[in-house]
Design a protein with these regions (language model features):
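C-terminal non-catalytic regions of proteins with extracellular/luminal or membrane-system context
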Residues: 1-390
Length: 390
């Protein structure tokens, strides 16, 4: 019987094990870096400008949507479009740090390639009051804050004080005889809007329990009045996630036009100077009813969290006894928006309050245009079936 030469056998086995280990490691590396290796060997089949092209097309689409979606609420004496392309922009919401691009939650997106309102005007050939714009940009306020569970942060109304505005009115009037006032409000999923106002006015933080979030603050009212008393041609732009109380548009004769623009994305701001300058005609219609007083809606009774101490200590989901759960009671059923206001009018609910027109400022589907239209019935066909005509 021949004897096995163990050292040789062990040597061969060890060599095979080493080879297997190397192959296994190589396979692991190849698998981990497969996309990189494949791209190096055969390329990815994509244009090197793919991302830039896609972003450009997305920006064009966003602008086009806003051109067709912005609602012209008011246009006295056909003030818009204007041939004067020199503009003063008042209101912190119109500044580079104040302009809102998107809401929170699912409506949020990348901040890459954002076009501020001031840049939009400049890119389309307008001349803005740069001294005024710089003052707003360096006033120490910013709407670029992290989204939190704290309504005092998310829904803080940030604006400058009255002295900031009045001290710049004379210089602004010398620059141009027209002014644009921008009013901004944030919004998104997961939070009701507060029934009172958290404010940051030139760095001074306060709470106004007499006003809800979607009406002008005292400081905004003061700004509007000061600007309207100085300029004979004033435009108002609402950059808001939700509609606001807008009765003040009828208070000042110098407010000639008003536009409603919800969050327009990164490039939607381009639509504003194009509409105001007559490059496109606004054609948007309201998807909501705008009442003079939001408390006239039954949904107001149950909206918001009355106590934000409770709001911050409660849970989104919980089955533990004794823990608060965040909720809103929808007692109003379907009667929100035009469902409520049109039904209530039909039932005569507003008769003792001056009628429907005293309650509703802008009805569902409202929206003006630069174009004029005539209505003419060219023909009518009557189908008679039995004793009744259809």
């Amino acid at each position: 019987m021949s004897k096995i030469k163990w050292p040789a056998a062990v040597s061969i086995s060890g060599g095979l094990l080493l080879v297997a280990t190397v192959i296994g490691a190589a396979n692991k590396v190849a698998l981990d870096f497969e996309p990189t290796i494949t791209k190096f060997l055969v390329g990815d089949g994509l244009s090197s400008n793919y991302t830039e092209e896609d972003l450009a097309q997305g920006g064009e689409l966003t602008t086009n949507i806003c051109e067709n979606g912005i609602v012209l609420l008011k246009n006295t004496d056909n003030a818009l479009p204007t041939e004067n392309w020199n503009i003063n922009i008042f209101g912190f919401g119109g500044s580079d740090n104040g302009w809102y691009y998107q809401g929170n939650g699912s409506g949020a997106g990348s901040s890459s390639g954002r076009i501020s309102l001031t840049k939009a005007f400049q890119d389309w050939g307008w001349t803005i009051n740069e001294d005024l714009a710089t003052a707003y940009n360096t006033c120490g306020l910013s709407n670029r804050v992290p989204v939190t569970e704290d309504a005092a942060t998310n829904y803080q109304i940030r604006e400058t004080n009255l002295n900031f505005v009045t001290s710049r009115l004379d210089a602004a009037k010398s620059f141009s005889d027209q002014a644009l006032i921008v009013i901004s409000r944030y919004g998104g999923e997961g939070n009701d809007l507060p029934k009172f106002q958290y404010k940051n006015i030139s760095g001074t933080v306060s709470v106004d329990t007499t006003r809800h979030y979607n009406e002008l603050s005292v400081e905004e009212e003061q700004m509007v009045e000061a600007v309207c008393n100085k300029f004979s041609k004033v435009y108002v732009l609402f950059n808001c996630c939700n509609v606001m109380e807008m009765g003040f548009l009828e208070k000042y004769p110098s407010i000639k036009a008003a536009l409603f623009m919800p969050m327009g994305g990164n490039a939607g701001s381009y639509a504003v100077p194009k509409i105001m300058g007559g490059l496109v005609s606004p054609s948007g219609k309201l998807a909501d009813t705008i009442a003079y007083d939001f408390t006239s809606a039954p949904s107001y009774a149950n909206m918001s969290y009355e106590s934000f101490d409770e709001r911050l200590t409660s849970k989104r989901f919980s089955d533990r006894k004794g823990e608060y759960i965040q909720y809103t009671c929808y007692q109003e059923d379907i009667y929100i928006g035009y469902y409520w206001y049109e039904t209530a009018d039909k039932e005569g609910y507003w008769d003792n309050a001056g009628g429907y027109s005293s309650i509703v400022q802008y009805p569902f589907g409202y929206g003006l245009s630069y174009s004029s239209f005539d209505w003419e019935i060219s023909s009518k066909k009557v189908l008679n079936d039995g004793d009744f005509s259809n």
